[in-house]
Structure formats: C-alpha cells, structure tokens
Amino acid sequence: MSKDQIIEAIKEMTVLELNDLVKAIEEEFGVTAAAPVAVAGGAAEGGAAEQTEFDVVLESAGSSKIGVIKVVREITGLGLKEAKALVDGAPAPIKEGVAKEEAEEIKGKLEEAGASVELK
C-alpha cells in the first residue's frame, strides 16, 4: 500500500474512525499524538509574550532637522553637537530599553517635530 493510498483511505474515514486509528497507532508504536502539539503550543505562547522594553530608533529627521535636533537634545540631554551628530547619523537609537509608555511618548514628540521613528 502506497502513501497516497493510505492518505485516500484516511480521507474517507469518519471522525470516530480516525480517533480509533490514532489510539491504535499510539498503542502499537508507543507514542502519543498530544506531545508534539503541546510542545508546538508552548513555543508559540513564548513567542507571543508582550514586549516590555523598547528601543526608540530615529529612522530619518525629515524636513525639519533643526526641530528634531531640539527634541533629541530634550529627550537625551545631549549637547547640540552630539544631538546633531545623532540626527545626521540616522538611523540611530535615541533611547534603549524604555517602557512602552515612555517609548510611545518619545516617538510622539519626535514625529511631531517631523522625524520618522520606529519602536523596536
């Protein structure tokens, strides 16, 4: 019997017959059908965990470079020269490892000044 013939036979089975088949395979080969599903489910849950720390990354200064430099100075506490170098070097991280609320606030200020910002 080929693999295709087995698949066709399975397609014709009812749900109860499939349940019996799974139980018979588990007993015959000493395996459980639930174990791989549980492992895959656990991995998916781990990937779906909500991120708690964000990096605010300046993608570009846009058309209002001076306004963006002022906001970067306000946020980071850098001097004019350092803030300008940071803005000129975009894409560049502005703040790293900040809470979601603070990251959203910083993003809002920078976008208001005309910058393009991404949270990572």
UniProtKB/Swiss-Prot annotation:
Keywords: Ribonucleoprotein, Ribosomal protein. GO terms for molecular function: mRNA binding; structural constituent of ribosome. SUPFAM superfamilies: ClpS-like, Ribosomal protein L7/12, oligomerisation (N-terminal) domain. One of its GO terms (cellular component) is cytosolic large ribosomal subunit. The keyword Ribonucleoprotein applies. Pfam families: Ribosomal_L12, Ribosomal_L12_N. The keyword Ribonucleoprotein applies. CDD domains: Ribosomal_L7_L12 (cd00387). Gene3D superfamilies: 3.30.1390.10, Single helix bin (1.20.5.710). It comes from the Bacteria. GO terms for biological process: translation. PANTHER family: 39S RIBOSOMAL PROTEIN L12, LARGE RIBOSOMAL SUBUNIT PROTEIN BL12M. Belongs to the bacterial ribosomal protein bL12 family. Homodimer. Part of the ribosomal stalk of the 50S ribosomal subunit. Forms a multimeric L10(L12)X complex, where L10 forms an elongated spine to which 2 to 4 L12 dimers bind in a sequential fashion. Binds GTP-bound translation factors. Forms part of the ribosomal stalk which helps the ribosome interact with GTP-bound translation factors. Is thus essential for accurate translation. This is Large ribosomal subunit protein bL12.
